[in-house]
Amino acid sequence: MEVCQELRKPALSLECGHCSFRGTDYENVQLHMGSIHPEFCDDMDAGGLGKLIFYQKSAKLFHCHKCFFTSKLYANVYYHITARHAASDKWSEQPKEQPSKDTESGKSPSPPERQNPAFDPAEARPTPALPMEAQKTSPSLCPESQASGPPVLEPQGAGPLISPEPQAPCLPAEASKAAPVPCPERVDPPCELPELEKPERGPSPESVKSALVSSKPPKHSSFADTGAAPSALSPESPVLATSPEPWGPSLSASPESRKPARTASPEPRKPSPAESPELWKPFPAIASEPRRPTPAVSPGSWKPGPPGSPRPWKSSPSATSGPWKSSKPVQPMSPGPWKPIPSVSPGPWKPAPSMSTASWKSSVSSGSWKTPPTSPESWKSGPPELRKTALPLSPEHWKAVPPVSPELRRPGPPLSPEIRSPAGSPELKKPSSSPDLWKVSPDQRKTSPASLDFPEPQKSSCGSPPDLWKSSFIMESQKPNVFSETRKHTASGSSESPKVASDIWKPVLSIDAEPRKSTLFPEPTKAVLPASPEPRKRALFPESRKHVFLPELPKSAVFSDAQKAPELSEEIQLEAVDNAKCDSLAQEGLLATPKKLLDEALSPSSKKLKKDSQENSDAELSSSEYIRADLDTLDTKGQESSSDQEQVDVESIDFSKENKMEMGSTEQAKNVLQFTEEKEAFISEEEIAKYMKRGKGKYYCKICCCRAMKKGAVLHHLVNKHNVHSPYKCTICGKAFLLESLLKNHVAAHGQSLLKCPRCNFESNFPRGFKKHLTHCQSRHNEEVNKKLMEALESPLEEQQI
């Protein structure tokens, strides 16, 4: 057998294709490659039987394609396949081909049998066993085997011609194969199916090996038989069948012989060509490869197949007329036959697809298998892509809304301090400056930025095209002339959500310059924050423009504004006095605005401006003075070009929003300080220590034997089991918390104003959920909002141009 294998696989080298290993024989190289290079296992020929071993990388397991056999050692699966599936594979392939021959030529059965014994007693022996087997297999394979049969006959004729050596080893298997073919012809194919299956398995691995060994002769035989294959249908076909060798090579015959057979018989070979000569080439080296497709069905599947009904096989043959296909192509050639086969034994089919698509592709027509099984890899890649796309969508939406030019964002920071000075009231600034407030506020800042500030949404609001910004800036220039009017215009025109903007602007108008410092920003933040991030930015920006950034307006507008500013500022002051109370309340409501963003955004120049603004706030300058200072800064900064001025305006707008946020954050800090003081008054560590102690890295409950690694677990235990009062209580609502961090988050939520969606009636106190809603609502109403904004901005732009 070994000699035959060597003869059959002269092209196969004893060297490993992936390293410098050189084996003593083919099996040695196979075991080396499977053990040392398992990642290439799917493309390896298992004992010359085809790509029957699948390597599962995740579990580091080797699987048999034809059954459920699994092992962590390649050698175990290799020997399993050579022992269990070598003979059965040959038989499964041959019977398929033979039944097809039988169907094509019902007269030929007897001649092949006679010829087989004549050729060799060994052949004669297999033939008797084959009749039963052939009968069994023929029913299941009838169409396929029949189709394959003629080509097999051709190889038979050529087989003997090829060489006596291959014939000798192959004859037993071939004879058995040929004999089964005539038997199925004689007997009804349906009844014969089980028998054929058995003989397929029955043929000793030796016969299989011999058949494999005579892969070259099959080639010749196939070529010579090309003409004979059609004749196989006629009485000549039995004659061909008589030569056991041709049968061996043709059925289990190396893929090479099958290739010529395909070429020889135009119809059957056509389907087999579908498999592609390349696939067949590997098969010659691995006579089992053709078997693999059948193995894919698995011997188990073959058995059920016959009982199930020859129909599936028939359908498969119809799918593949070629005798060779009957063995392999049957599965690949037509999805239909494959489906029935799985129904016969779903188990084997499942493992096969789960195996590697590569192996399936090689064994079966690559096209058909690729599409149905789609390797798990393809599925994986697919879903991740979907996931990726889905994930990016949300950020993209946010970004799309934000499309504010980076320039606008950048310039903003330096202006923010200015905004702070005019916008923030001295009182607010003082607390913010105080270290205590800042210390406490950072937590709130963290929460607030995540909650109230949606940097992306804000960007998106800013993201409105520069034209919108320009228009808003122009509106600002108009604002100094008539604060109330300009505010209204800016609110309607510049804010992305006109409705929200108008609402926000109204309070702003009522508020005076000073109240704006402390309150205007917080109020707009309230209105703006609830509004979609876009409304926030624009609403905030228009406000900042109105109050603080009038100077940022174009020079011409700024000058006129500066002249009118004092008068307006006086009026605003009067309004501020009236609205100061409301502003203070609003400020208290805005606790969650983030300071971190403001600090990061501020540049050294902004810090200087901040100092100046703080001094002004300390002096409690009038709003007119603030406006003048702003105008001066704008004059100094924006004397370059109109475009530069516009950029400055954008920056100032961005930072006016930040100023508002800072104001809110300072208020938050105040609340937090109060809370911490009250909390300490509530309960002290000493009181907690009464019920809990720490030792050896663990916390112990003094009331019982409970102990835990973390303090929080023991606190929960004390509260739930021993009714100990929670150490941290909220002074606003009285709710108790076990951990200080939980209480801080709760208090911060109290400080936050109710978030309202500008596009619908949605309201929420939870910034995280509100942000999710905004993403949904924005994507839904984005187009409508953009249209409205464009329309609103067009009118102010036209006025400015005039």
Swiss-Prot record:
Q: Which GO terms describe its cellular component?
A: condensed chromosome; cytoplasm; kinetochore; nuclear body; nucleus; spindle
**Ubl conjugation found in the keyword field:** yes
Annotated signal sequence range: none
* Role this protein plays: Required for proper alignment of chromosomes at metaphase and their accurate segregation during mitosis. Involved in the maintenance of spindle microtubules attachment to the kinetochore during sister chromatid biorientation. May recruit CENPE and CENPF to the kinetochore.
Q: List zinc finger spans: C2H2-type.
A: 728-750
Gene3D superfamilies with a match to the protein in the record? Classic Zinc Finger (3.30.160.60)
InterPro entries membership = CAMP (IPR039330), Znf_C2H2_sf (IPR036236), Znf_C2H2_type (IPR013087)
- Which residue stretches, if any, does this entry annotate as coiled coil? none
Q: What's the protein called, per UniProt? A: Chromosome alignment-maintaining phosphoprotein 1
Where N-acetylmethionine occurs, residue numbers?
1
Going by the UniProt record, its keywords in alphabetical order are: Acetylation, Centromere, Chromosome, Cytoplasm, Cytoskeleton, Isopeptide bond, Kinetochore, Metal-binding, Nucleus, Phosphoprotein, Ubl conjugation, Zinc, Zinc-finger
Organism, by scientific name, is: Mus musculus (Mouse)
Q: Where located?
A: Nucleus; Chromosome; Chromosome, Centromere, Kinetochore; Cytoplasm, Cytoskeleton, Spindle
Give the Gene Ontology MF terms in alphabetical order. Answer: zinc ion binding
Give the GO biological process terms. attachment of mitotic spindle microtubules to kinetochore; protein localization to kinetochore; protein localization to microtubule; sister chromatid biorientation
Region of interest: Mediates localization to the spindle and the kinetochore and is required for the attachment of spindle microtubules to the kinetochore: 440-580
Residues that bear N6-acetyllysine: 479
Against SMART domains, the record matches this protein to: ZnF_C2H2
Segments of skewed composition (Pro residues): 332-351
Which of the residues bear the PTM Phosphothreonine?
371, 447, 593
Regions of compositional bias (Basic and acidic residues) in chain numbering: 88-105, 185-203
